[in-house]
């Protein structure tokens, strides 16, 4: 049990300049005990024994953050294996995390509570609101099941997570610095604040923050509780400046609160809450190391055996927000408008299955398969298939695709940030062109170095793919290099250090609850330098 987890965790997280970063964080915030709070643990027990690294860009980023801050990690036991691990020896599991002094602590809701919290409210209700995915003429239908899932699932699991955070915080010798992550845990900050008023609390929202009107899909008690939860923070972090503006508007319109747009701050309950944006990024050194690894080179050798003259690629989870079906429709139009491309181009869709226990997601994967199948049967020949559809998970294969694309299609309906586009910009070695949705958070940073598209406009998307395939080599090279430079500079270390600076500058110890200088120019925060 625990020993294996220790062995796995120690010795990871060396990338991304994490040791200098660790020194910087402890210099900047010396008097705090950091606690990272996330629905998922960084390591997950496998049914056959041993542990797997938590998958996904967010977990990778949070591992770097935990390593940089030496944070304890509070997670939710999400399945029987984790519940069993948490209950071993009659005590919650606390194991060394990374090379830091931190430990891992579980909250342990019942299977039913977890399902209501995660499988009903978080996904799809909140996810679909925050990505504008509901077909509002027909759904959602907010019935007794959803009301019960809210109170007995979402509120209850947030309460259990907050209780665990408070226990960990009270055991610490320094002032707690609570770093909460994502849409599953909106209520935690207020709950922790009630128990530990002196805590410094930040919540980082990884998904888009929609307009106040769209939040009105949720019944008022639910959306009020979400705002109240977040306003327990000192700082609420978002992926883009648009998310910050939407959040401030939501506080003003739906919450009736006093907002200072220039300072990007809300006054609530006699406290000032700041809203700031910190676009998440990737660990540049780790990603480059992976791209140069033998495993990736083996995948590239396999790719070379079947690679067409022109390779269009996409790497995504099979989530309706990723807009995969419209991407296929646009590609079909490309082939019909430009028949000379048939036989010399192939669209490689390398997709990771997502949330197949949620009906909307399993239906979406079916649609993806059907659309690819139809296009292949109508336009394909014995020698050539227009779409190569692979449903699997392999980080090495994904990186091999990103190193070799001519066009990378990243066309989400809405996306908090999108790390695939940053990985592609960093590792691509073929002067590939990125076609990027204007509704991805990453568009704010990369807009000048990509071909921007409206994700709903399949004609424009087809035209952008064609422009990418036919662009002159000098322009391709220039765009490719410029995008890479943006990612190199705005790496994961900068994401973390910008947050740390704001925690120091905006929430300095001993400052009055309401800053009298709120309406004076703010200190020189990282955000100011960026905007």
Where are these regions (language model features)?
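Catalytic cores of carbohydrate-active enzymes across secretory and cytosolic contexts
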Residues: 3, 7-531
């Amino acid at each position: 049990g625990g020993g294996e987890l220790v062995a796995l965790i120690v010795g990871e997280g060396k990338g991304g300049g994490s040791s200098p970063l660790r020194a910087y964080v402890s210099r900047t915030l010396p008097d705090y005990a950091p606690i990272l709070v996330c629905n998922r643990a960084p390591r997950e027990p496998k049914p056959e024994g041993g542990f797997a690294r938590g998958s996904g860009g967010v977990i990778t980023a949070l591992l770097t953050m935990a390593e940089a801050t030496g944070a304890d990690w509070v997670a939710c036991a999400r399945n029987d294996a984790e519940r069993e691990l948490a209950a071993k020896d009659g005590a919650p599991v606390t194991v060394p995390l990374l090379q830091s002094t931190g430990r891992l602590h579980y909250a342990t809701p019942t299977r039913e509570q977890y399902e209501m919290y995660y499988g009903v409210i978080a996904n799809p209700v909140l996810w679909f609101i925050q990505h504008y995915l509901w077909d509002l003429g027909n759904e959602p239908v907010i019935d007794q099941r959803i009301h019960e899932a809210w109170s007995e699932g979402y509120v209850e699991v947030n309460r259990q997570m907050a209780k665990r955070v408070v226990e960990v915080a009270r055991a610490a010798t320094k002032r707690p610095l609570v770093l909460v992550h994502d849409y599953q845990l909106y209520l935690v900050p207020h709950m922790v604040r009630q128990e530990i008023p002196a805590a410094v609390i930040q919540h980082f929202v990884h998904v888009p923050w929609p307009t106040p009107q769209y939040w009105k899909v949720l019944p008022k008690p639910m959306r009020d509780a979400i705002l109240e939860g977040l306003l327990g923070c000192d700082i609420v972090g978002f992926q883009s400046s648009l998310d910050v503006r939407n959040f401030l508007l939501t506080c003003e319109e739906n919450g009736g609160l006093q907002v200072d747009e220039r300072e990007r701050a809300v006054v609530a309950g006699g406290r000032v809450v700041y809203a700031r944006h910190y676009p998440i990024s990737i660990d540049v050194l780790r990603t480059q190391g992976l791209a140069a690894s033998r495993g990736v080179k083996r995948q590239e050798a396999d790719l070379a055996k079947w690679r067409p003259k022109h390779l269009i690629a996409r790497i995504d989870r099979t989530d309706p927000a990723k807009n995969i079906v419209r991407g296929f429709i646009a590609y079909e139009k490309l082939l019909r408008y430009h028949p000379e491309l048939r036989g010399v181009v192939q669209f490689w869709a390398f997709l990771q299955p997502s949330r197949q226990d949620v009906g909307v997601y399993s239906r979406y994967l079916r649609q993806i398969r059907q659309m690819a199948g139809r296009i292949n049967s109508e336009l394909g020949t014995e020698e050539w298939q227009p779409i190569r559809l692979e449903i699997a998970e392999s980080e090495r294969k994904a990186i091999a695709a990103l190193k070799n694309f001519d066009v990378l299609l990243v066309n989400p309906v809405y996306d908090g940030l999108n790390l695939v586009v940053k990985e592609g910009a960093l590792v691509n070695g073929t002067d590939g062109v990125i076609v990027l949705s204007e509704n991805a958070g990453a568009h704010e940073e990369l807009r000048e170095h990509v071909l921007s598209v409206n994700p709903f406009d399949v004609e424009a998307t087809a035209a952008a793919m064609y422009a990418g395939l036919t662009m002159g080599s000098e322009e391709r090279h220039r765009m490719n290099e410029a995008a890479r430079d943006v990612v190199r500079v705005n790496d994961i270390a900068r994401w973390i250090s910008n947050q740390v600076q704001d925690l120091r500058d905006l929430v300095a110890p001993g400052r009055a609850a309401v800053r009298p200088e709120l309406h004076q120019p703010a200190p020189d925060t990282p955000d100011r330098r960026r905007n």
